[in-house]
UniProtKB/Swiss-Prot annotation:
This is Uncharacterized protein L300. Residues 23-43 are annotated as: Disordered. Disulfide bonds: none annotated. The lineage of its organism: Viruses, Varidnaviria, Bamfordvirae, Nucleocytoviricota, Megaviricetes. It comes from Acanthamoeba polyphaga mimivirus (APMV). It comes from the Viruses. InterPro entries: GIY-YIG_endonuc, GIY-YIG_endonuc_sf, SLX1_endonuclease. It holds the Pfam family GIY-YIG. Residues 2-82 form the GIY-YIG domain.
Length: 166
């Protein structure tokens, strides 16, 4: 069994994205793609072909992974350019949201990891610094054929690396 990971997948049919978590990557991807007749995957992903964009690992346990997933997903509800201003200033580049669902999910992730604190087994958004700043030891982002993601301004506790399917 794999350790718990949070993942981003994208539909080849519609370019929609989906964030989830699992402790068995291949089984879960097969579920999303309906390759396992006894399992159907998440209702929202049925009937499409999905490919992995990235996996995030390094969580202490299942609860930590699930809280990370929840925090990352929640950011898509109220996107605004203001949240990327500090990251733009730090990295000296201009990041913005656009009409690409994959790009927007990556921007949400970038914002989330720059503004989290880790309390107990939960990741909390801490952009207004209401909580003590406690960062995780190390999180790893395994990126599938999207090398531009490694070039973004990730915090020091994030390690990115590419996995190529060539």
């Amino acid at each position: 069994m794999d350790n718990w990971v949070c993942y981003l997948i994208m539909s080849l049919d519609s370019k929609e994205t989906y964030i989830g978590s699992t402790n068995n990557r291949q089984r879960r991807l097969n579920d999303h793609n309906n390759l396992n007749p006894s399992r159907k995957g998440a209702k929202r992903t049925r009937g499409r072909t999905w490919i992995p964009i990235l996996y995030i690992s390094g969580f202490e346990n299942k609860n930590a992974c699930l809280s990370f997933e929840s925090g990352w997903k929640r950011l898509s509800k109220k996107r605004n350019i203001q949240r990327l201003l500090l990251i733009n200033e730090i990295s000296n580049i201009k990041l913005n949201y656009n009409n690409d669902p994959k790009w927007n999910r990556i921007m949400d992730l970038l914002y989330f990891v720059h503004n989290i604190t880790f309390i107990g087994t939960k990741f909390k958004l801490n952009s207004d610094v209401k909580h003590p700043v406690i960062l995780p030891e190390n999180l790893f982002i395994e990126i599938m054929n999207e090398d531009w993601i490694t070039e973004l301004s990730w915090p020091y506790f994030i390690n990115t690396y590419m996995i190529s399917f060539d």
